[in-house]
């Protein structure tokens, strides 16, 4: 089955403990992303920063066989289970081929 590409835009909470939750879940989240990269599901991504350079969210480009598969990944990601990402937008996406 052909994979579909998606962009995930996720915003962290804005409470005083938000950055601590992110940092506590970060290594597990990155390990998950490394596995996805090896499996071909992770395209690119990184942190959204505020004007002071503090991480306040993430943008992730991924490819899955279905939206359901993407939702399964999201539900298990440490940034979701660790209550880091508070608002998540998912949109279909297509990488330009240069």
For the regions a protein language model found, what residue spans apply to each?
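Conserved, structured core segments of small domains
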Residues: 1-98
